Amino acid sequence: VAGGLGSHEQVSYWLNHGADAVQVGTAFAVTIEGDAHENFKRVLIDADPGALAEFTSVAGLPARAVRTPWLVRYLRQEKTLQAGACADPRRCSQRMDCLTQCGIRDGISRFGQFCIDLKLAAALRGEVSKGLFFRGASRLPFGKAMRSVRELIDYLLDGTMPAAA
C-alpha cells in the first residue's frame, strides 16, 4: 500500500488487513539521517495542504509537489509549453534518457515539459527557487519536528511517540 500513510493507525490497519508492506515517502525524506539538504527537508516539513499543487509529471504520471517559485512559474506556462511539444532527442539537456517516456524529449504534449533530473537535483541541493519538491498530502507524523529514522519506525510500527525534544 502506498501513499497517504503517516500514522501508526494507518500502517497497522493495512498490515492487519493483508498488506505485505506499506510505502511511506515524505516522512522518511525529512528524517535527520536523510542526505538531502536542510532546505529540502524544511520545504517538505513546512508545506501545508494549500501549498501543494497537482499536475502531470514529465513521465506522464500524476504528481503532487510544493508550490516553489519554479513550480509556480512552470504551472503558469504549462499549457503553452505543452502546445509546443515536439519529439527531439536533443531536447534532453542531460543526454541520459533517464525515463522510458519523457514529455520533453519525446514531445508528448499531455506530459510535463521540464527536465526532471535537473529539478530533482536542485531540490536535493536545497535550491528552493529552482527545485521540484514532491510531497505527499498527508500530515507528517511529527508535525514540524525533524526526527530520526528509528523514532519514525518505532512510531509507525509500535505507536511509540518520541519524547518531546
Annotate the PLM regions:
Residues G6-A165:
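Conserved active-site-proximal phosphate/metal-binding subdomains
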